[in-house]
């Protein structure tokens, strides 16, 4: 009996230690970003930094306004979500409820392959195929634009949304569907009015993963967006928060480097706010 209790205590201690490591890593990253990012904000001014419309970090009279980056990231992420979530969600319903077994194996393999493709490959294909296509189709001077970035991001978030949504839908107890069918509902009504609402927390988690992937992507975006610090427009070259950091960090110094850490802090806070909002709405729905 004592040996069993000792073993349980050891296992509990190991899991506690591993959990503390995870929490500690998050705290270290948070503290580091705050310590590194706040000096630039205090020097530039919070209002000028967040709402300034011009970024010229290497000019003689440097300007550090990141409003174009914030708006571009918001528009780009929202655009990717508007495209990626419906496609990913409906694909997940098809995979979990409708698809024949042989076809499901093929589709799941394709989704897994899509998830494993490196970001630079997405960017390369987008740069060689999508960007010229947009230029020819819409008769614009340069296809490297916000639209190209939205399309690439929408494709990149599909695997996360599909996989997590499929897992959530398959976790719904079969008794729910059996009861619905017994009451005379069709299969389609059962899937969308019973199974989907029951799996809404998992589907919401899939959406958050997609948002996080879209907000945090840099390599593919920098290859198809043009990476110009303009105010966002669908057919103009733009720069995201992530690409601003990635494109300038290698040669930055002084206030410019501090400002890049401030951008990273803003991006980090965006992710925290999105997660907090999701948890709030899920808890409210559960209570309601």
List each language-model region with its residue ranges.
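Cytoplasmic-entry segments and transmembrane alpha-helices of multi-pass inner-membrane transporters
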Residues: 12, 87-126, 288
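Transmembrane alpha-helix signature in integral membrane proteins
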Residues: 66-94
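Interhelical loop and adjacent transmembrane-helix boundary motif
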Residues: 221-267
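Transmembrane alpha-helices
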Residues: 164-165, 187-222
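Transmembrane alpha-helical segments of polytopic membrane transport and secretion proteins
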Residues: 1-19, 278-288
């Amino acid at each position: 009996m004592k040996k069993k209790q000792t073993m349980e205590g050891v296992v509990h201690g190991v899991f506690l230690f591993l959990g503390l490591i995870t929490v500690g890593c998050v705290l270290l990253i948070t503290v580091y970003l705050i310590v590194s990012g706040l000096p630039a904000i205090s020097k530039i001014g919070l209002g000028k930094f967040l709402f300034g419309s011009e970024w010229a970090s290497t000019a003689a009279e440097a300007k550090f306004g990141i409003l174009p980056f914030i708006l571009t990231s918001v528009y780009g992420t929202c655009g990717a979500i508007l495209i990626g979530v419906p496609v990913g969600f409906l694909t997940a319903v098809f995979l979990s409820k409708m698809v024949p077994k042989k076809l499901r194996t093929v589709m799941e393999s394709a989704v897994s392959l899509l998830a494993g493709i490196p970001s630079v490959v997405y960017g390369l294909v987008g740069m060689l195929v999508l960007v010229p296509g947009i230029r020819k189709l819409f008769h614009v001077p340069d296809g490297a634009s916000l639209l190209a970035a939205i399309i690439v991001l929408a494709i990149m978030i599909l695997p996360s949304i599909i996989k997590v949504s499929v897992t959530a839908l398959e976790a719904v107890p079969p008794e729910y569907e059996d009861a619905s069918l017994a009451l005379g509902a069709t299969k389609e009504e059962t899937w969308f009015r019973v199974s989907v609402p029951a799996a809404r927390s998992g589907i919401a988690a899939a959406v958050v993963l997609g948002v996080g992937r879209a907000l945090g992507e840099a390599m593919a975006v920098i290859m198809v967006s043009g990476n110009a610090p303009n105010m966002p427009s669908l057919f103009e070259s733009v720069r995201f928060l992530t690409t601003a950091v990635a494109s300038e960090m290698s040669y930055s110094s002084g206030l410019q480097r501090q400002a890049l850490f401030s951008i990273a802090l803003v991006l980090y806070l965006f992710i925290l706010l999105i997660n907090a909002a999701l948890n709030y709405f899920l808890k409210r729905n559960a209570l309601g």
